[in-house]
């Protein structure tokens, strides 16, 4: 079994992946980083959080090998579903979760993250977001990915804001989805470690920064906010973020 932890960029996907991964590890699953090493998947599962990238046949079939050999592990992605990915999900070989956020806050966070990366001289996935329009188009692409995952009935859908404000309830939903027992003593320290108030911004792979709901209202000017409302409006209403 492969647990596929998918997330909108800058929507707590690193936080959610590590929570999911550590819950599974505490329940007897395999360490994905060891799977990556043992099965020579360094070119498939990249970065600290074992990101598979696009769900292409080559990548999916590569990670399917250790799964079919009896290994249970968690991988991360930001990409949308594909025909083969959807087939494997329907067959129960992949169990997907998807976390998303108010795209206005996610867009702001991506722009700021890219700016910090450029200032450090260390390009990252957001370095190209050098202006408002580029960031807007970037987020529109990920809203289409959000739409595709919301159509996946087998996926567990989670809002980042709900993780921040009702962590226990959202963790219970995740545990139920994974088939784990909350009363398992091994899981208690994991759940505690990832509480929003306990999360450390410097924790490797967590990518936890401001974590403030509605921060775009104070950081973007009125014209920019109106553009976001006009562009994202149809999505915002369906996502539950319509003012």
Each predicted region: which residue ranges?
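PAPS-dependent sulfotransferase catalytic domain
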Residues: 1-153, 158, 226, 230-241
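The conserved 3'-phosphoadenosine-5'-phosphosulfate
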Residues: 30-51, 74, 151-222, 226, ...
